[in-house]
C-alpha cells in the first residue's frame, strides 16, 4: 500500500493518520499523531482455534521511555513489566473494540499500540483507541465499526475536547467517551462530584466529536477502496438446536419463574436441566442426526442452552418487569455493613455485603516514604493513595491457580481508587500514604462497587478524614428491539446475559467515578441518561446503610498506626540533616527509632508508632536547623571535658562550651566536680562570637525555661 496521510481537525487540534509507511507485514497499521505524541497501532489476524467458545482478542499497549527521551532505570536499563497505566490503557482499547467483533469469530486477533513519541501535553490513550479502529479496518477483519474515542474535560463551565495534562489536573472531570455509528459504546470517568445532568451533557458533547472521527475513518477507507468485511456466522445444526429447545425451554422457564434469591440454588437447577439434555442425547443411537451433530460440535449443547436461558431471562424482564430473583427493576439487594471487623493490628477494616457479594477492605496508613514511584511516561510521578483489588477463585466457588493480579483486577482496583480520590484529605492536612486492599470474599456481581463501599468504611474506621463518604452501584440493561429496561444493582447472571455494565460511584452531592461497558454495538443518549439518573437513588440508599454503621471518621487511630509529625526547614539545610553518607540522619533514626522522610521543598515528616519517639526526633531536627540566638535554652549532653570547661552538644553536629566560671553561681574548683561526660544539662546560649563559636552558661535560667527544655522544646 502506498503512503497515505489524512488530517482531521478536532476542536481546533489536528489528528494525523499515516498509513502505508510502517509495519508492512501487519494486517493493518496506522501511525496516529496529535501534537508531538505519536502512537503506532497494528491489528493482525491469524487462523482460528479449535474447541474454544470465546473471541480470542489480545490487546497490548506498550510505552517506550525513549518516547520521552528517557533511559529506563534498573540494572538492565530496559522496559520491564508494563506499569499499571499501560494495563489500564489496554483495557481502554479492548472494551469498546470487543463488542464490535462478531461473537462467533474464533480467529486469533491481536491489537498492539506502541507510544513511540510523547510530549507533556497530549495523552496517548485516546489516540490508541481510535488507532485500533483504523488498524482493524485496514486489516479487513469482520468489524462493526468504525469506532473512535475522545477525552472530555471540564474547566470552569466549559467542556474541552482532548484536554492537555494540565487542563485535566485543573478541571473537575476526566471523561473518555468511545462510540460507534450505533451510539456510545464505552465511558470511563473520574470526577470531582460532577452533577448527573452535567455528566450526561459531557458524554453527549464527547459523542458528537466521536461521530466526526467515525465519519473521517469512513472517508479514509472509501478513499483507499477498502470494503468492510462481512463473513457468514457458523450455524448450529437445526436438528440439535430444536431437540435441545424442546426439552429445556419449559424447565428453564419454571426455574426462572421461581424468583430464587440464592444464586447457587438457581445455578444448580439450571445445570441439572443442561445435564439432563446431555444424557438424553447420549442415549440416542450413534447414527441419530442429533447425536452426530453433538459429537461433531461438543460445545453446541451449551451454546444453545445459554441462548435459550438468555432469551427467557430477558423476556421475563422486558415483558413482566421482574428479575430472576424477584426484585423490581430499580430495587437494590439487601445490604449490611460492619467496621472494625479485624483486630487493631490492621489500621482500619470494613466489611460490605450486598446480596451474595461480600467485600472485605483493609486500610493501612503509611509514611510519605511509602508513596509509589511511577516509572512511566506520565507527569504524575508519585501516588499517595493505592487501592488493590483481589478476586480469589473461592469467591465464585471455583478452583484455579492464584498468580499475580490480572488486567481485570488491576482495572477494578483502579476504578475504586478513582472513586475515592477526590474525597481524600490533602497531603498538608493528612500526610499519610494510604493503601486499601479489597478482598472479594464472595462474588455475585458489582464487586468493584462493593470495593468502593468497603474502601470508604475501612478508611473511616482508620480515622482518615474523608471530605465525604463515597458509595457505588452497578446498573444493567436489557434491550430487546425498541424495548429497553434499565436494571439497578445487577447480579452475576444479569451481567452475563445482559447488554450493559454501568458502574456509578459518588457522594451524596455528585459523581466521582463512572465506567460503562457494552455488549451491544452502541447505546442512545436517552438510555444513558436514564441509567445515570436511576443510579442516584440506589447510591444514596447504599450510602444511608453505610452511614448507619459509621457516620464519620474515627477520632482516634489504631495504636499500631504510625504517628506523623512534620517540620519545615530551609531546603539548604537538607544536607546538614542527612550528613555525610547519611550518617546524621541514620544517627537520629537509631537514637529515636523514628523514620524520617525529607522532601525537596524542605518538608520533613517524622513517623513512629511511639509518639514520644517521633517528638524526640523532631526536637533533634528542630535543634539542628534552628537559627541560634543568645538567650536560647537547650537540654544538651556533655561530650568532653577540658580544664577550663565542658563541651555540650545542644543538637546533632552543634556543640558549645561552658566555661568553668559559667557552671555554677559559686567558685568551681574542677569541672569534673559539676559535670561528667554523658550528663544531660540545661544550658543557655550566652554568646555567639564572630567566629561562629557558641558560648554557653548554666546561670540565669528561669525554672520555666528549664522545664520546657527538659520537656522536649527550647525557650528563647
From Swiss-Prot:
Annotated GO CC locations: cytosol
EC top class, as a word: transferase
Segments forming domain S1 motif: 631-699
SMART domains referenced in this protein's UniProt entry, alphabetically: KH, S1
Domain of life: Bacteria
Protein residues bound to Mg(2+): 495, 501
Database matches in HAMAP family: PNPase
Stored PANTHER family: POLYRIBONUCLEOTIDE NUCLEOTIDYLTRANSFERASE, POLYRIBONUCLEOTIDE NUCLEOTIDYLTRANSFERASE 1, MITOCHONDRIAL
Protein name in the entry: Polyribonucleotide nucleotidyltransferase
Gene: pnp
Amino acid at each position: 500500500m502506498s503512503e497515505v496521510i489524512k488530517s482531521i481537525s478536532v476542536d481546533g487540534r489536528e489528528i494525523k493518520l499515516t498509513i502505508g509507511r510502517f509495519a508492512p507485514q501487519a494486517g493493518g497499521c496506522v501511525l496516529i499523531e496529535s501534537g508531538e505524541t505519536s502512537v503506532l497501532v497494528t491489528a493482525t489476524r491469524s487462523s482460528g482455534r479449535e474447541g474454544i467458545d470465546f473471541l480470542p482478542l489480545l490487546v497490548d499497549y506498550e510505552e517506550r521511555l525513549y518516547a520521552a527521551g528517557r533511559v529506563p532505570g534498573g540494572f538492565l536499563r530496559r522496559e520491564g513489566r508494563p506499569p499499571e497505566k499501560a494495563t489500564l490503557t489496554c483495557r481502554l482499547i479492548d472494551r469498546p473494540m470487543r463488542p464490535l467483533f462478531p461473537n462467533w469469530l474464533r480467529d486469533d486477533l491481536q491489537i498492539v499500540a506502541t507510544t513511540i513519541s510523547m510530549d507533556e501535553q497530549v495523552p496517548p490513550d485516546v489516540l490508541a483507541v481510535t488507532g485500533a479502529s483504523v488498524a482493524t479496518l485496514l486489516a479487513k477483519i469482520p468489524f462493526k465499526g468504525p469506532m473512535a474515542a475522545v477525552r472530555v474535560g471540564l474547566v470552569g463551565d466549559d467542556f474541552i475536547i482532548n484536554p492537555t495534562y494540565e487542563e485535566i489536573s485543573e478541571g473537575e472531570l476526566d471523561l473518555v467517551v468511545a462510540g460507534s455509528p450505533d451510539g456510545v459504546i464505552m465511558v470511563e470517568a473520574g470526577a470531582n462530584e460532577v452533577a448527573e445532568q452535567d455528566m450526561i451533557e459531557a458524554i453527549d458533547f464527547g459523542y458528537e466529536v466521536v461521530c466526526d472521527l467515525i465519519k473521517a475513518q469512513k472517508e479514509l477507507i472509501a478513499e483507499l477502496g477498502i470494503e468492510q468485511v462481512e463473513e457468514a456466522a457458523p450455524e448450529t445444526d437445526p436438528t440439535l438446536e430444536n431437540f435441545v429447545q424442546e426439552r429445556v425451554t419449559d424447565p428453564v422457564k419454571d426455574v426462572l419463574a421461581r424468583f430464587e434469591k440464592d444464586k447457587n440454588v438457581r445455578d444448580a437447577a439450571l445445570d441439572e436441566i443442561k445435564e439432563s439434555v446431555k444424557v438424553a442425547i447420549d442415549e440416542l443411537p450413534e447414527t441419530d442426526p442429533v447425536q452426530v451433530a453433538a459429537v461433531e460440535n461438543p460445545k453446541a449443547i451449551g451454546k444453545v442452552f445459554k441462548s435459550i436461558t438468555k432469551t427467557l431471562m430477558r423476556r421475563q424482564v422486558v415483558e413482566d418487569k421482574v428479575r430472576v430473583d424477584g426484585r423490581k427493576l430499580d430495587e437494590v439487594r439487601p445490604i449490611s455493613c460492619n467496621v472494625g471487623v479485624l483486630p487493631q493490628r490492621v489500621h482500619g477494616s470494613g466489611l460490605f455485603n450486598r446480596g451474595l457479594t461480600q467485600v472485605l477492605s483493609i486500610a493501612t496508613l503509611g509514611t510519605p516514604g511509602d508513596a509509589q514511584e511511577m516509572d512511566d511516561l506520565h507527569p504524575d510521578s508519585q501516588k499517595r493513595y493505592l487501592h488493590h483489588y483481589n478476586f480469589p477463585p473461592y469467591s465464585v466457588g471455583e478452583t484455579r491457580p492464584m498468580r499475580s493480579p490480572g488486567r481485570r483486577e488491576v482495572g477494578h482496583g483502579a476504578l475504586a481508587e478513582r472513586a475515592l480520590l477526590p474525597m481524600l484529605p490533602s497531603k498538608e492536612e493528612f500526610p499519610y500514604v494510604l493503601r486499601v486492599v479489597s478482598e472479594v470474599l464472595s462474588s455475585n456481581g458489582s464487586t468493584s462497587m462493593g470495593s468502593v463501599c468497603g474502601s470508604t468504611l475501612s478508611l473511616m474506621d482508620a480515622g482518615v478524614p474523608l471530605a465525604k463518604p463515597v458509595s457505588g452501584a452497578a446498573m444493567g440493561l436489557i434491550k430487546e428491539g425498541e424495548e429497553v429496561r434499565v436494571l439497578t444493582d445487577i447480579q452475576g447472571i444479569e451481567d452475563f446475559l445482559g447488554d450493559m455494565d454501568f458502574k456509578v460511584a459518588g457522594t451524596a452531592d455528585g459523581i466521582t467515578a463512572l465506567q460503562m461497558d457494552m455488549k451491544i454495538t452502541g447505546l442512545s443518549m436517552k438510555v444513558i441518561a436514564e441509567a445515570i439518573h436511576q443510579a442516584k437513588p440506589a447510591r444514596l440508599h447504599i450510602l444511608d446503610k453505610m452511614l448507619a454503621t459509621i457516620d464519620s471518621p474515627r477520632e482516634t487511630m489504631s495504636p499500631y498506626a504510625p504517628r506523623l509529625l512534620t517540620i519545615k526547614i530551609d531546603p539548604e539545610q537538607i544536607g546538614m540533616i542527612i550528613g555525610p553518607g547519611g550518617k546524621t540522619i541514620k544517627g537520629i533514626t537509631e537514637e529515636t527509632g523514628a523514620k524520617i522522610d525529607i522532601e525537596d521543598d524542605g518538608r520533613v515528616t517524622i513517623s513512629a508508632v511511639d509518639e514520644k519517639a517521633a517528638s524526640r526526633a523532631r526536637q533533634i531536627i528542630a535543634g539542628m536547623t534552628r537559627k541560634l540566638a543568645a538567650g536560647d535554652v537547650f537540654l544538651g549532653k556533655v561530650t568532653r571535658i577540658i580544664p577550663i570547661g565542658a563541651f555540650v552538644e545542644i543538637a546533632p553536629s552543634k556543640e558549645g562550651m561552658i566555661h568553668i566560671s559559667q557552671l555554677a553561681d559559686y567558685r568551681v574548683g574542677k569541672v569534673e566536680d559539676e559535670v561528667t561526660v554523658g550528663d544531660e544539662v540545661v544550658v543557655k546560649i550566652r554568646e555567639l562570637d564572630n567566629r561562629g563559636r557558641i558560648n554557653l552558661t548554666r546561670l540565669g535560667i528561669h525554672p520555666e525555661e528549664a522545664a520546657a527544655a527538659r520537656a522536649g522544646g527550647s525557650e528563647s
